[in-house]
A protein has these predicted regions:
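Short beta-strand/loop element within the Bergerat-fold HATPase_c
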Residues: 62-75
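C-terminal end segment of the histidine kinase catalytic
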Residues: 129-141
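Glycine-rich/acidic phosphate-handling loop/turn and adjacent ATP-lid/helix
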Residues: 74-103
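A short, conserved alpha-helix near the extreme C-terminus of the histidine kinase catalytic
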Residues: 103-111
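Glycine-rich ATP-binding loops of the HATPase_c
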Residues: 112-120
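Conserved short strand/loop->alpha-helix "switch" segment adjacent to the catalytic nucleotide/phosphoryl-transfer site
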Residues: 16-49, 53-65
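Glycine-rich nucleotide-binding loop
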Residues: 87, 122-128
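Short beta-to-alpha transition helix within the HATPase_c
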Residues: 1-15, 70
Length: 141
């Protein structure tokens, strides 16, 4: 997944990050997922990273985005996407938001990945996704 995350994040930065100096820090880790998990995982990452470039740096013109994927144990996958941008506006409950992108991301995490998505708002925004790795089918790096 490392190569895909790297390509995706750099592509989204070129599309949405013009006029801003956003540093991408990707923590490499060899994580293999089945295709049935790699596809929804890629869709979720696309939405989260797009949202960062569209919304996290409205007030700031520079910042940092950190993306990591790891396996804290042999069957658990942990993905973290963190920015030091403006943060989620006070009083905004992202769980009740009706925006299609974030709603889709939550559905893919809970429905297809059978995982959890947690959001922290502290000096920017950090989203953590955790799910159990499946053993079905061919693995995608």
């Amino acid at each position: 997944m490392d190569g895909h995350i790297r390509e995706l994040s750099h592509h989204l930065q070129s599309v949405y990050g013009s006029g801003k100096k956003i540093d991408l820090i990707l923590t490499p880790s060899k994580v293999y997922l089945s295709v049935s998990q790699a596809i929804p995982c890629a869709l979720v990452l696309n939405e989260l990273i797009s949202n960062i470039f569209k919304h996290a740096f409205r007030e700031k013109k520079q910042g940092t985005v950190r993306i990591s994927i790891s396996t804290p144990d042999p069957i658990t996958v942990l993905i973290k996407v963190k920015d030091d941008g403006d943060g989620i506006p006070e009083g905004l409950d992202i769980h009740s938001q009706t925006g299609l992108g974030l709603k889709m991301a939550r559905y893919l995490v809970s429905g297809q990945l059978k995982g959890e998505m947690c959001v922290k708002n502290d000096s920017g925004t950090e989203i953590s996704i955790q799910f159990k790795r499946s053993n079905d089918g061919k693995k995608y790096e």
